[in-house]
Structure formats: C-alpha cells, structure tokens
Amino acid sequence: MKRIVCIICAAVFALTARAEIRLPAFFADGMVLQQQATVRIWGTAAAGAKVTLTAGWDNRTYTCKAASNGSWALKVKTPAAGGPYEIRISDGEEIVLRDVQLGEVWICSGQSNMEMPVKGFLSQPVEGAFEMILDAGKDNVRAFTVARRLSDTPQADCGGKWVAASAGTVPDISSVAYLFACRLHRTLKVPVGIVVAAWGGFWGGFLPGKLRKRFQKRSAPGYWR
C-alpha cells in the first residue's frame, strides 16, 4: 500500500514539476501581428527551460531561457504583410499557432461609444448594421475583444479570442473599430487586426492606480455640457 502511495505521489510530482508553455490569450490561432516590425512574444514555462520559437514566414528560430519565475519573452522580426503562417513554440513540448496573419494591428479603446457593437445596444440600433453584416467577410479583418474583468492589480493576461470577420462574428464587434478596420483594409490592402478594449462608463479602470487617485476628488466645473 505504501509503495502504491509513493508511486502516485511521484507521478503527481513529475506532472507538476514540468510546467508546460503557456501563452496569453492574445497569442493564438488566427491572430494578426504587426508587419515590418520587431514584435514581442511572451509567456511562461518551467523555470530555466529553454524556449524556442520558429516563425513560419522565414523559418528563423529564436531562443531564450525562462526566468526563475517561469517568464520568458522573445523579440521576433516580421516582414511585409502576408499569411497565413504558423508559429512553433517549444520547450520540448511544442505549441503550434496556426493561421497567423501579418498586417496592421490597432488598439481600439474607450467607453460606450467604442464598446457599442455592430448589433447595437438594447433600443439603440446602429445605422447601417444590416449592410455591414451582409458584407462581412469581404474584408480581411480580425478582431480580439478583451473580456470584461475586474482586478485590483495589473494582470499578465486577459480573456478574449481572435475572430475573423463574418456574418456570425461581426454583430458582436465594436462598430467604430470594425468600420475603421474595414476602411484601413480597403486602403492598404493588407490584413487588419483590431484589439478592442472598451468598457462603458469605466474610464478609471484604464488608468494606473496612482494616477487614478489624482482624479477621484476632482469635480466638474459649474458649467459643462
């Protein structure tokens, strides 16, 4: 009996001792990375692990060593717009990111006017939404909408996933961000990725704690509109 317990404990220890590579939600299948740039890709692995990344656009391999807390980061060079590509990341166990596009990436942040999706809010429709949904898919646009999440401290990751523009996904994408991305794609003829981080009436959540405290006691002037 003791031998069985020891074997089970050893197996559990072996599984927990090896921390697999983990990536933030942003680095996933279908993502868009900035073209003609040096982009930073990061994640976690077992402390001291050798992490390698191979970029599909030039088959160049980048290598680094995970820090004592498991964090690692690599700076990867990207060429002109194109795709789809694969990115392979390994510490002995490989992760493959598929359907990666290189193009223009923009952060679209704000309050309710940026958050409002193509389908609109309750009793607040968006003009032209029906046409936008019907035309969805004609433009090479992908969106990552950051999920709402509260925290008292800065976070290393967020909820969300990349979606390609289609009749099924466009209704839930920020209307302002989507129209901007479509115009950008039609002008530049390259893939466009938008990262939507918007939350109506929640401006304070986008400020660092120390900076936010400076505005807590400020009041609006006597006359405003």
Protein language model annotation of sequence segments:
Residues C9-R18:
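Hydrophobic h-region of N-terminal signal peptides that target proteins for export
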Residues E20-R225:
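Cell-envelope and extracellular/periplasmic
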Residues K2-I8:
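Sec-dependent signal peptide recognition
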